[in-house]
Each structure stands twice: as structure tokens, then as C-alpha cells.
Curated annotation (Swiss-Prot):
Site (Transition state stabilizer): 78
Alphabetized UniProt keyword annotations: Cytoplasm, Decarboxylase, Lyase, Porphyrin biosynthesis
Protein's UniProt name: Uroporphyrinogen decarboxylase
Keyword set includes Lyase: yes
Matching NCBIfam families: hemE (TIGR01464)
Substrates-to-products reaction catalysed: uroporphyrinogen III + 4 H(+) = coproporphyrinogen III + 4 CO2
HAMAP family: URO_D (MF_00218)
Length: 355
């Protein structure tokens, strides 16, 4: 594989010295970019775009072409590829978000689910990873990702998005045996899927636990974090002569950073409700931190964006171990020029913290 020209992102995850704080952005390939909207229109719809390796590669690289400051590319895909490959039948309703043709309701449903083979059942994702790595040609590292078992389980049990997770939580409390069976199968599937991405060329991986923060403290430990730890334990940690860092991101997980720091992951993603300085004090030197600007700051003028970047950099303080990001994905209505101002501010203002 081609040597990396910019490994700042990987170095920061391993708390090695960097010249400036690296930056990437969740959903950096997304609807706020006119070029993304044009490619999506060419594909016809989101699922067709995601399942076409050439077009998925095109949209992955678009933000890097527009913003030379970006220090990583993230695979263009969706967290729901695994349930789709298990036969749930993913589709998107306009204005409704993701739906499944089949929901999971019983232990029998769960026992019937296959563990997808990454190359056979999710080959379009592996092909996209290979295509993107080839096209990047060492420009920046490529991040692979998956949803967490708990987050995937909520979609599978609810049959799509949910505001209150009533079916998933009812199963968790009424029938913990069934929920554990589902989470165990999903943990096996996510481990195989992320290892497939690593073998295909992903140089770091992130586990998105979007709905872990909806759980009680006790339920989070038992039904979310325990399964993410299981995944981390089963991942390929060295590939292509380099460490493959793992980032755990639980939205709403700020209360549980200490136990997340014991997961074996190299880094924790933070949402914007955490103070990054106190998060750093709490986790010590165990893990790097990623985040954590409120995505809504990007609606403000560039001077306000710059001020918030300065505040977060000062809160983290000097030294490596910080990857700048938003606290969640960028929203579609943001002006692309504001994203550019954000990236420029991070590199420019962070240099002083790395001397």
C-alpha cells in the first residue's frame, strides 16, 4: 500500500506528537455539499449511492478536494448495512428516516438471523473501501465504521427510527435473554465487518453508539458498553505495519467516560454536552479524545465559529491526543464556506498548543 503523506490523525489517536490538531468531521461527505447532492441525484437515491463503490468513493473524496485541511477521509456508508445484510430489508421513507421491511420481535426471530460474511454479503462496502484507498493514494488515512450492537438493535426491534425506543427497552427489561442474544449476534457481525474493512484498507475504525445515551447507567454497561468491549477485543489491531486505532463514540455518554476509557479503544468521541478539559482530566493518559463542537455553531458567522474553536482548543490544552471534530454530524443546511472556516481555524489556532 502507498505510504501515508499525512498521518497526523493516526498520530493524534496514538497520542504521538503532531504539528497541529488534526480535523475531520462526522458526515463530512453529505447533503451540505452541492457536489454530494449532484452525485446522489445521479445515483437515484441514498441506498443506490451507498451500494455503488465508485460513487461511494466519489462522495468520500469530494470534501477532501474542497477542503485541503481535512486530515482523514471516512467511508461513505450507513450504520444499517449489517441489519440489511441480515435480511431486514432497509429502505428510506422521505422525511421518515430509515425503515426495515421486517422487525425483530422474538428469540425465534433473532435465532434465525445470519451473521453476514463481509465479502459475500457486504462486498459493496469492502469494494468501496478498496476503491477509496486506491484513489486516496496515501493522501490521508481512511476511517471505517459500524454502528454499535445496541444502536443497531434499536433499529431492528423498532423497525426503524424511534424517539422513545419503547419496543427495544421493553425487550431489554422483559426479555433480557432475547436482547442479549441479539446483541451477541450483532457483536459477532460488527467484529467481522470491521475486520473486513481493515483488511480492505481502513486505517482506523469508529463504532457509532448513537443511542447508548438513551440507556440508564446500569443498562448502558450491560447492554451497550460490554458488547463494544467484546468487539474491540476481537479487532485486528495491526495491519500494513501500523496500529489500527479504534474510536468509541456514545452520543450522550459523557457520564461514563471512565468505564469507556477501560474498553481497550484508543480514543473516545465526545458530544458537545461534555467539557473536553474535564473529560481529559477524567480519562488521563488512557485514551485520546475526539470532538466536540456543537454542530449548530456552523450556522453562526465565521468569527463566532473561530471563537468556539479557540475555546475548545484552550479547554483541551497543550499536547497531542486530541482529534478535532463536531459533537455529532454536520447538518444539511450549513453553508459550505462555514465548514471551511471551521477547518482553517482548527489548524491555524492549534499550532501554538503543539510547540
Amino acid at each position: 500500500m502507498t505510504a501515508l503523506k499525512n498521518d497526523r490523525f493516526l498520530r493524534a489517536l496514538l497520542k504521538q506528537p503532531v504539528d497541529v490538531t488534526p480535523i475531520w468531521m462526522m458526515r463530512q461527505a453529505g447533503r451540505y455539499l452541492p457536489e454530494y447532492r449532484a452525485t446522489r441525484a445521479k445515483a437515484g437515491d441514498f441506498v443506490s449511492l451507498m451500494k455503488n463503490p465508485e460513487l461511494a468513493c466519489e462522495v468520500t473524496i469530494q470534501p477532501l478536494d474542497r477542503y485541503p485541511q481535512l486530515d482523514a477521509a471516512i467511508l461513505f456508508s450507513d450504520i444499517l448495512t449489517i441489519p440489511d445484510a441480515m435480511g431486514q430489508g432497509l429502505y428510506f421513507e422521505t422525511g421518515e428516516g430509515p425503515r426495515f421491511k421486517k422487525a425483530v420481535g422474538s428469540l425465534a426471530d433473532i435465532e434465525a438471523l445470519p451473521v453476514p460474511d463481509p465479502e459475500k454479503d457486504l462486498g459493496y462496502v469492502m469494494d468501496a473501501v478498496r476503491t477509496i484507498r486506491r484513489e486516496l493514494n496515501g493522501r490521508v488515512p481512511l476511517i471505517g465504521f459500524s454502528g454499535s450492537p445496541w444502536t443497531l438493535a434499536t433499529y431492528m426491534v423498532e423497525g426503524g427510527s424511534s424517539k422513545d425506543f419503547r419496543k427495544s427497552k421493553a425487550m431489554l427489561y422483559d426479555n433480557p435473554q432475547a436482547m442479549h442474544a441479539l446483541l451477541d449476534k450483532l457483536a459477532q457481525s460488527v467484529t467481522a465487518y470491521l475486520n473486513g474493512q481493515i483488511l480492505a484498507g481502513a486505517q482506523a475504525v469508529q463504532i457509532f453508539d448513537s443511542w447508548g445515551g438513551a440507556l440508564s447507567a446500569a443498562a448502558y454497561q450491560e447492554f451497550s458498553l460490554a458488547y463494544m468491549k467484546k468487539i474491540v477485543d476481537g479487532l485486528i489491531r495491526e495491519h500494513d505495519g501500523r496500529r489500527v486505532p479504534v474510536i468509541l463514540f456514545t452520543k450522550g455518554g459523557g457520564l461514563w467516560l471512565e468505564s469507556m476509557a477501560d474498553s481497550g479503544a484508543e480514543a473516545l468521541g465526545l458530544d458537545w454536552t461534555c467539557d473536553i478539559g474535564s473529560a481529559r482530566a477524567r480519562v488521563g493518559s488512557k485514551v485520546a479524545l475526539q470532538g466536540n463542537m456543537d454542530p449548530a455553531v456552523l450556522y453562526a458567522k465565521p468569527a463566532a465559529i473561530r471563537a468556539e474553536v479557540a475555546r475548545i482548543l484552550a479547554a483541551y490544552g497543550a499536547g497531542s491526543g486530541h482529534v478535532f471534530n463536531l459533537g455529532h454530524g454536520i447538518t444539511p443546511e450549513v453553508d459550505p464556506a462555514h465548514a471551511g472556516a471551521f477547518f482553517e481555524a482548527v489548524h491555524e489556532l492549534s499550532a501554538a498548543y503543539h510547540r
